[in-house]
A protein has these predicted regions:
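N-terminal low-complexity, intrinsically disordered segments
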Residues: 1-85, 91
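Macromolecular interaction modules
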Residues: 9, 13-15, 170-172, 245-246
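Short beta-strand-to-loop capping motifs
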Residues: 17-21, 94-96, 200-206
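Long, compositionally biased interface segments
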Residues: 195-251
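Short, highly charged C-terminal tails/helix-capping segments
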Residues: 55-58, 127-134, 239-251
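Aromatic- and glycine-enriched beta-alpha-beta binding-site module
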Residues: 83-132
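Aromatic/basic-lined ligand-recognition segments
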Residues: 1, 69-78, 82, 93, ...
C-alpha cells in the first residue's frame, strides 16, 4: 500500500480499465501494443478467445467478427508485472515484489497512455483499483479478530469454531464517486495453505464527468487524480480492516 510494510500480506494489486466499444479497435492492436513494450515485457501469451459482454449485461452483437477476441498477456522478466490487453480492455497486474504505490501508479499511466496512443479517442466506462491480501494465521485454532477488525460475530448457539467464512460489503464513496467492494474470508491457496483473505476493490463506473460531457479519456489530469484518491481510500480501508496490533507487527 502507501506505506511499504516490512511484512507484506499483499499478493496482487491490479488496475482494470474498461472502455466503451470503439470503431477504432482492430484485431492487430494488441500485437502493435506488444511491439511497443516488448523490451519491458518480453513474454507474450495469447489467451483463449473471450466473448465480450457490454456494460449493463447486454450481449455484444457477435456478427461483428472482432468482438470475439483472444487477449494478449504480457509479462516482464521477473514475472512481477502482467499486462492484459483485449477489446476495450486494459488490465495492469502487479505481483510481488511490489515496490511502492508511486511506481505502480506510473506503470498504470504509462500502459494507459500507450493504449490511448494506439487506439485514439476512447471513453472510460469502468475503472477499478484492487488490492488482494493473504494473511497467514498460525496452524491450528486461531481467532480471526487477532488479524481482522471486520469479522463475523455470531450469537449462541452459532458461536462455534468456523470451518470457513465469507463476508462481502459494498461501501459508497462520494469523492471520487465509487463503490468499495470489501471482501474477507478464509480461502485455500493453490499450495493447500489456508489463509485469511482481505480483498479491496475500488470501482467507478458510468462516470458522469466523462460521459455527460462527451469528453475523451484524459490520462493527464482526471485519471491521475482518480488513481491517487482511489489508492488513499483503499489504503485507509486496509489499515482500518486490520487488528491494530497485527498491523503494527507488519510495519
Amino acid at each position: 500500500m502507501g506505506e511499504l510494510l516490512t511484512k507484506q500480506p499483499l499478493v496482487e494489486a491490479l488496475c482494470e480499465l474498461r472502455f466503451s466499444p470503439s470503431d477504432q479497435w482492430d484485431t492487430a492492436l494488441p500485437k502493435r501494443f506488444y511491439a511497443e513494450v516488448k523490451d519491458e515485457f518480453p513474454e507474450c501469451t495469447e489467451l483463449n478467445p473471450v466473448f465480450q459482454v457490454a456494460v449493463g449485461g447486454q450481449p455484444v452483437d457477435m456478427s461483428e467478427p472482432n468482438k470475439a477476441l483472444s487477449r494478449l498477456q504480457l509479462r516482464n522478466k521477473d514475472n512481477s508485472v502482467v499486462v492484459q490487453i483485449g477489446a476495450d480492455l486494459l488490465v495492469v497486474h502487479h505481483l510481488q515484489p511490489y515496490t511502492n504505490w508511486e511506481n505502480f501508479r506510473d506503470l498504470i499511466l504509462r500502459m494507459g497512455s500507450k493504449y490511448v496512443e494506439l487506439i485514439g479517442e476512447v471513453k472510460l466506462e469502468r475503472v477499478g483499483l484492487r488490492y488482494i491480501n493473504h494473511i497467514s494465521p498460525p496452524e491450528g485454532r486461531f481467532e480471526i479478530e487477532q488479524f481482522l477488525s471486520v469479522f463475523p460475530i455470531l450469537p449462541s448457539p452459532l458461536n462455534l469454531d468456523l470451518a470457513g467464512f465469507s463476508q462481502v460489503y459494498e461501501f459508497q464513496y462520494v469523492q471520487p464517486k465509487a463503490v468499495l467492494k470489501h471482501q474477507t474470508g478464509i480461502v485455500q491457496r493453490g499450495d493447500g495453505k489456508v489463509v485469511l483473505l482481505l480483498d479491496l476493490d475500488f470501482i467507478s463506473q458510468g462516470i458522469e464527468s466523462i460521459e455527460s460531457s462527451n469528453k475523451i479519456f484524459d490520462l493527464s489530469s482526471w485519471f491521475q487524480n482518480w488513481l491517487n484518491q482511489a489508492h488513499d481510500c483503499v489504503e485507509a480501508a486496509f489499515i482500518s480492516s486490520l487488528n491494530p496490533d497485527y498491523y503494527e507487527s507488519l510495519r
